[in-house]
UniProtKB/Swiss-Prot annotation:
A Pfam family: MMR_HSR1
Biological processes, Gene Ontology terms: division septum assembly
Protein's job: Necessary for normal cell division and for the maintenance of normal septation.
GO cellular component, one term: cytosol
Any GO MF annotation of the entry: GTP binding
Cofactor dependence: Mg(2+)
Protein name: Probable GTP-binding protein EngB
Disulfide-bonded cysteines: none
PROSITE patterns associated with the record: G_ENGB
Protein family membership: Belongs to the TRAFAC class TrmE-Era-EngA-EngB-Septin-like GTPase superfamily. EngB GTPase family.
Alphabetical list of PANTHER family matching this protein: ENGB-TYPE G DOMAIN-CONTAINING PROTEIN, MSS1/TRME-RELATED GTP-BINDING PROTEIN
Species of provenance: Lactococcus lactis subsp. cremoris (strain SK11)
Length: 195
């Protein structure tokens, strides 16, 4: 599959199942903590500055944003989790919306789960990974913000993350930086094998 990253549109921002796109394109969901760099990851992969809206305010993505990539697939931007300044009720609502999508959507082929390479995975990161493994959803684990860690320490940080998450070696692990473009090719290779 060849992807023309110049052909991009936003299909819909969906709050529930009845709003999901009706075509049968494969979907790759992107999940991670607020401010882990999801929008930057999408923009870097697609070589666009502001396609996915980046926000200085974490917790801005409150719907499932379906991005049409070259009329061939959707990237589905899932609301960032672990954002404290959102009411418990609001978080529960997001949780139900995310769970409904991840457990019932037949078009879903894999989830890009993003973690910050600088820190041990949070409880939310661990729960998300366990959830995806429980439902047998393929995971591409992406450690973002690699430019903030000296290259010589990448292996150490990778080991810490994998150990904390009880990483399944059948999943992909990619070190990524939207600043210096590390990991773009590896990310596309991992995504395309699920399509």
């Amino acid at each position: 599959m060849t992807i023309n990253t110049n052909n991009l549109t936003i299909t819909i921002s969906a709050a529930s199942k009845k709003q999901y796109p009706e075509n049968d394109w494969p979907e790759i969901a992107l999940a991670g903590r607020s401010n882990v760099g999801k929008s930057s990851f999408i923009n870097t992969l697609l070589n666009r500055k502001n396609f996915a809206r980046t926000s200085g305010q974490p917790g801005k993505t409150q719907l499932l944003n379906f991005y049409n990539i070259d009329d061939q697939l959707h990237f589905v931007d899932v609301p960032g989790y672990g954002y404290a300044r959102v009411s418990k009720k609001e978080r529960e609502k997001w949780g139900k919306m995310i769970e409904e999508y991840l457990t019932t959507r037949e078009n879903l082929k894999a989830v890009v789960s993003l973690v910050d390479i600088r820190h041990e995975p949070s409880e939310d990161d661990l729960m998300m990974y366990e959830f995806l493994k429980y439902y047998h959803i393929p995971v591409i684990l992406v450690a973002t913000k690699a430019d903030k860690v000296p290259r010589g320490k990448w292996n150490k940080h990778e080991s810490i993350i994998k150990k904390a998450m009880k990483f399944d070696s059948t999943d992909d692990f990619i070190i990524f930086s939207s600043t210096d473009k590390t990991g773009i090719e590896e990310a596309w290779t991992a995504i395309l094998k699920y399509l």
